[in-house]
């Protein structure tokens, strides 16, 4: 179980949201929705421990993710902007992720699922935005963690790829995984998802 308790986040001197709480249980999909600039990405990056919350806590199975390396190893994050290095080939990227997790045996399965075999020798920077997205999402399968956190999972994907990723996410949840997604609005792809709405804030600047 992943639990966000009274989380507040700040960007610069602007309070994005405050006292946000929700629980994401195993076997569930949580969809974080909100307007552009509302703080969806900031919340996801806080959940995975990349940036600190201004206040509140994020816990996985009762352990604070900011101090537990065991928690971080159970989470895979795929951001809206890919973290892939442009000069690396697709094969090199998959091997790097697998090396980080000790999951080299999963490279072929990820490449097969996302149809990456024809582009394994292509440098990431030379791919279209749609193929770059497929490569970025393949990290979910290579890393094989219990918690998936994905920012705008369907951006830049064609309809066939959207269906592929939808099935992947549903299957992960059915098998007991925790899936947290962010998008601009609710969609019909995950009708049973828990919705976490980030409301507009009128709090303005933050003072200490």
Curated annotation (Swiss-Prot):
PROSITE patterns from the UniProt entry: ABC_TRANSPORTER_1, ABC_TRANSPORTER_2, CCMA
InterPro entries: AAA+_ATPase (IPR003593), ABC_transporter-like_ATP-bd (IPR003439), ABC_transporter-like_CS (IPR017871), ABC_transptr_haem_export_CcmA (IPR005895), P-loop_NTPase (IPR027417)
Pfam families cross-referenced by the UniProt entry: ABC_tran (PF00005)
Reactions performed catalytically: heme b(in) + ATP + H2O = heme b(out) + ADP + phosphate + H(+)
Cellular-component GO terms for this entry: plasma membrane
Biological process according to GO: cytochrome complex assembly
Residues that, per the record, bind ATP: 34-41
Keywords on record: ATP-binding, Cell inner membrane, Cell membrane, Cytochrome c-type biogenesis, Membrane, Nucleotide-binding, Translocase, Transport
Protein EC: 7.6.2.5
Localization: Cell inner membrane
Residue span(s) of domain ABC transporter: 2-208
GO MF annotation terms: ABC-type heme transporter activity; ATP binding; ATP hydrolysis activity
Topological type in the membrane: Peripheral membrane protein
Coiled coil: none
Signal sequence interval, chain numbering: none
Family: Belongs to the ABC transporter superfamily. CcmA exporter (TC 3.A.1.107) family.
Protein's job: Part of the ABC transporter complex CcmAB involved in the biogenesis of c-type cytochromes; once thought to export heme, this seems not to be the case, but its exact role is uncertain. Responsible for energy coupling to the transport system.
Subunit structure: The complex is composed of two ATP-binding proteins (CcmA) and two transmembrane proteins (CcmB).
Protein name, per record: Cytochrome c biogenesis ATP-binding export protein CcmA
Recorded name of the encoding gene: ccmA
